[in-house]
C-alpha cells in the first residue's frame, strides 16, 4: 500500500480523521498528505522537538505548557509521551503518533469523539511498527 493510500483509506477513509499527513521521523520529508492539509516546516520542527524532549522531573514536556501549532492553528496539548501527542482546540483536535520511521499527523473534527480518532491512528501506528516502519 502506498503512503497516500494509508492517508486516504486507513486514516481519512475511516471517518474518524478528516485530515492527515505522514512524515519521515525527522519531520523534514512529507510522504503523503490530505489535500489542503499543510503542516509547515516550523510546525514539524515543534513536533520533532516535542518527541526529543524527555520532560522535567515530573515527566512534563515543554509542549504541554506552550501548546503545538499544526496547519496554522494552535492546540492545547493534553498528552505528550515518547509515542503520542494529543492536542485539542475547542471540540476538534490532533492525534500525532511516532512510529519507528514515520510521524502520523492527523486532525479530527468536532463531530468525532477523540477516543475514536486516537484508536484509528494508534492502530495504524501499531501496524506500521509491526512491519518495520
What is each residue range found by the language model?
Residues 1-133:
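Non-catalytic interaction/Regulatory regions outside core domains
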